[in-house]
């Protein structure tokens, strides 16, 4: 099980790789704010990835859960903060792409990773080729995924 923020769900759904979360982690838990961000707002904007994420919720492998303890974290979005709280509650990995959110999660003692971790794990488990992972990252970047040159180079080094 993992707790995911909106960005990894959107990025992976846009490139047709959302299924990797189910293959690698079994169940994904998201908070209601993340559902609003990914599905409701996405559908309002006509984003096809919103329908892919909605189907995963309907299929039951992405579960929506409300965070009981509402807490505001300085410098990060509500969805990231709620993802951190869910990961803490379930004692699982938090999937967050934004660096500020990742730092807060780490400060709270959580193991935090991002979308590239999913692709790296998919290569390690034989679910995706190295070339396929590189093409997927390039496609994600083309769809608006922001990544530093340093992190991109590290990803390429890690999967080789």
What does each model-found stretch correspond to?
Residues 30-31, 57, 102-160:
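Acidic, PIN/NYN-like endoribonuclease modules and their adjacent C-terminal/linker elements
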Residues 1-92, 99, 110, 150, ...:
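Active-site-proximal, substrate-binding regions of enzyme catalytic domains
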